[in-house]
Amino acid sequence: MNELDSLVESARQRFAQSTSPADLENAKAQFLGKSGRVTELMKGMAQLCVAEKKTRGAAINLAKQAIEAALNARRQALADAQLQQQLTADALDVSLPGRQRGQGGLHPVSLTLERIEGLFGSMGFDVADGPEIETDWFNFTALNTPEDHPARSMHDTFYVEGGTAGAPNLLRTHTSPMQIRHAVQHVKAHRAALDAGQPMPEIRVIAPGRAYRIDSDATHSPMFHQCEGLWIGENVGFKDLKVIFTGFCRRFFESDDLVLRFRPSFFPFTEPSAEIDIRFQTGPLAGRWLEVAGSGQVHPNVVRNMGLDPEKYIGFAFGMGLDRLTMLRYGVSDLRLFFDGDIRFLSQFR
């Protein structure tokens, strides 16, 4: 083995002994650095003739290439070993049972809304929808609310930008505007039949959604959920209201012995008007009268604002708080619990 072969073999052995990238770089310097052994051999050719330089230089370059190849091979081996070590440290046991994803559920008020829509849907009622930012006309005027009614004041109603002095915009204070919008569209769709003296299909609709009033305590929230119902036809009376609402309450609370009481009251959009109370015969609320809704026969002015003749068309309306119904159904005493976002509370309703 000549000098150059011995040098290459020595470099290979030194590289093989390197156990880290830093140690390998030190070994590289011993052979390929500025003061390395290969560099020293190149410097030693200064005293050779031209022909000898050519032969000697070619041999040294071959040795240098062999050393560089050994260096790169060892460098790659160290990198592969480091990668394998990292993969081993980060390895996952795929045979372990996985973590189950948390199971979500509907909010209790949403459960109540679904139940109400299903019950009234089985009685032939459609479900209306409408904007939460309303005009003064749909929220108050169309519902026969006087200009000086306290509900119109800024102490009770959230007014918003975008309207005019004579027609301000506001956050709807109830879901009744959806009933008016639905009725107006219904009448427009059947205007030709009405003008021809033909009967119009009845308006039978519920209007569930969010409403807003300036109020906040254990039983009230500035934002609350409401569901109102409307039935307009040529021969719809208070007796129909009692039958429909009694049937709804008994099915909603799953209590056939539930008792309902209709108390005279006043609302500008109905005449006559009544508050509806319920009384359970059994359970923790047994024997107590609990107010659940307002109702009445639709006022002639409201029927007229729908585009109908109040001499021919009549009907009833009712409105109930979804939050209160949810509180009664699940035995919750503080309305604010529904909106605090506490998963410990909400998970009970899955």
UniProtKB/Swiss-Prot annotation:
Binds 2 magnesium ions per tetramer. Transmembrane segments: none annotated. InterPro entries: aa-tRNA-synth_II, aa-tRNA-synth_II/BPL/LPL, Phe-tRNA-synth_IIc_asu, Phe-tRNA_ligase_II_N, Phe_tRNA_ligase_alpha1_bac, Phenylalanyl-tRNA_Synthase, tRNA-bd_arm. It is found in: Cytoplasm. One of its GO terms (cellular component) is cytoplasm. It is an enzyme of class 6 (ligase). GO terms for molecular function: ATP binding; magnesium ion binding; phenylalanine-tRNA ligase activity; tRNA binding. It catalyses: tRNA(Phe) + L-phenylalanine + ATP = L-phenylalanyl-tRNA(Phe) + AMP + diphosphate + H(+). Keywords: Aminoacyl-tRNA synthetase, ATP-binding, Cytoplasm, Ligase, Magnesium, Metal-binding, Nucleotide-binding, Protein biosynthesis. Mg(2+) binds at residue 271. Its cofactor is Mg(2+). Its EC number is 6.1.1.20. Tetramer of two alpha and two beta subunits. Belongs to the class-II aminoacyl-tRNA synthetase family. Phe-tRNA synthetase alpha subunit type 1 subfamily. HAMAP family: Phe_tRNA_synth_alpha1. This is Phenylalanine--tRNA ligase alpha subunit. The lineage of its organism: Bacteria, Pseudomonadati, Pseudomonadota, Betaproteobacteria, Burkholderiales.
